[in-house]
């Protein structure tokens, strides 16, 4: 959250605020550089976040200097050459990271992301002129209380404005990722994007197609973790970026739902995302959980169903989410969780469910994911604009599930009283799908009746299952 008092500070009060927050260790690092005869300034996002009351959110401290990387490496014991090609090294001092970059201006950008080369310069003013946004183009020397603000960044902080340093067209052609970063900063800070800057975002958005999927993913994740991600996602739609980032979500704008929802599919998805907990997995799950509704509606209409219904929309939503997650290189672990949450978010518990049905539900969803699935259901309810919190039936289901978990019921194949080795030894089998199929069939029996989970009983049941599977296989081969 932003400290509103901070952005109302005068120039002199800004200096006082910076002086009060900067740590002794940071002063030691700066003094080490200055005592060696070089200039050293705190710069960029670190200053911005201090002035906005967000210093605790900024892990790295950014420093600009006229010292070359090799000269910095001689001054400190632990230095990592993180971006030495572009003049950047990272100093580790008392477990704090300091990203130190030589004053520079960037030469021509060949890949719309990185400069082909950099040219070192001797003063901070030239260095600040190459930066992306005015609120990031600040520099401060705490030893003489000099705050350099060549591009009215302090004023833009006060006005809550995201504005490029200089010509937005040139800034975006230099580094197209700045297009997404502008929207991400707008979302995380709840700032407006200056009119000319936003016009150029709309004109230049196709440049993002030249940026790696991983870079866009990282910016999108940061946007999702803002206090109100719907703010940033709406900017993605207005700027036409959403049309190629998540085209299915973009096309859900204006797709009306039934009387149980106050909002269309698009805004319902955004508000559900806002209502979910601050994790990438939960926010993506909430954002995509209903994105398959337009396709589901089309399929229903094509089948002659005239009502405004969305049968199997969770199936289509999972497919759309999977496509996005693979395209933007999310981890397999995240993909597995997100797709499973979307797949099962339409669960419908009634009091007629048997204990076996409850166990089967926990088994297919996974015990670890149950709390996340319920959290998604709550976010879904909040996002429809009419319902808030847990209905009584959902609380009853939650209690039932917790009882099953507390009583250590067998819910997975590994919970069975026998394993694959027992199956192979008993029937003289080698590792195969047949062994796995027998274990799956045994688990289905145990989910219905926990009393069956005894070794002698399961081996007896396994023999019946084995004979049936072999018989079915023989009949299939004869029909061939």
Predicted regions and their residues:
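Catalytic cores of the polymerase beta-like nucleotidyltransferase superfamily
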Residues: 1-480
């Amino acid at each position: 959250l932003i400290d509103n008092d901070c952005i109302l500070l005068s120039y002199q009060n800004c200096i006082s605020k910076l002086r009060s927050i900067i740590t002794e260790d940071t002063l030691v690092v700066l003094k080490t550089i200055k005592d060696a005869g070089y200039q050293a300034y705190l710069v960029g996002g670190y200053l911005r976040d201090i002035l906005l009351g967000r210093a605790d959110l900024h892990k790295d401290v950014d420093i600009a200097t006229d010292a070359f990387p090799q000269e910095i490496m001689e001054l400190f014991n632990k230095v990592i050459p993180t971006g030495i090609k572009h003049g950047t090294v990272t100093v580790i001092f008392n477990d704090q990271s300091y990203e130190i970059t030589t004053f520079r201006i960037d030469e021509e950008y060949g890949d719309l992301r990185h400069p082909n080369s950099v040219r070192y310069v001797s003063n901070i003013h030239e260095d600040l002129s190459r930066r992306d946004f005015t609120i990031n183009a600040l520099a401060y020397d705490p030893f003489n209380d000099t705050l350099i603000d060549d591009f009215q960044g302090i004023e833009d902080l006060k006005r809550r404005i995201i504005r490029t340093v200089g010509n937005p067209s040139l800034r975006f052609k230099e580094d197209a990722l700045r297009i997404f970063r502008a929207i991400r900063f707008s979302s995380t800070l709840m700032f407006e994007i200056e009119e000319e800057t936003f016009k150029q975002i709309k004109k230049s958005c196709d440049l993002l197609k030249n940026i790696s999927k991983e870079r866009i993913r990282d910016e999108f994740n940061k946007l999702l973790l803002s206090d109100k991600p719907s703010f940033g996602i709406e900017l993605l739609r207005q700027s036409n970026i959403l049309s190629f980032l998540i085209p299915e979500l973009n096309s859900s704008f204006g797709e009306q739902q039934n009387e149980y929802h106050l909002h269309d599919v698009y805004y319902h998805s955004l508000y559900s995302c806002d209502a979910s907990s601050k994790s990438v997995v939960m926010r993506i799950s909430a954002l995509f959980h209903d994105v398959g509704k337009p396709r589901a509606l089309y399929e229903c209409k094509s089948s002659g169903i005239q009502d405004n219904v969305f049968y199997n929309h969770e199936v289509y939503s999972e497919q759309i989410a999977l496509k996005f997650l693979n395209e933007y290189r999310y981890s397999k672990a995240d993909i597995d969780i997100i797709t499973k949450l979307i797949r099962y978010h339409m669960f419908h518990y009634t009091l007629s469910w048997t204990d076996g049905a409850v166990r089967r539900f926990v088994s297919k969803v996974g015990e670890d994911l149950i709390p996340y699935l319920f959290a998604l259901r709550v976010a879904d309810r909040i996002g429809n604009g009419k319902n808030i919190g847990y209905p009584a039936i959902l609380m009853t289901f939650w209690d039932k599930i917790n009882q099953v978990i507390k009583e250590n019921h067998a819910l997975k194949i590994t919970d069975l009283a026998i394993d694959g080795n027992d199956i192979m030894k008993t029937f003289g089998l080698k590792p195969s799908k047949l062994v796995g199929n027998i274990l799956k069939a045994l688990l289905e029996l145990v989910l219905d009746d926990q009393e069956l989970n005894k070794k002698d009983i399961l081996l007896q049941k396994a023999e019946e299952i084995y004979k049936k599977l072999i018989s079915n296989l023989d009949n299939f081969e004869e029909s061939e």
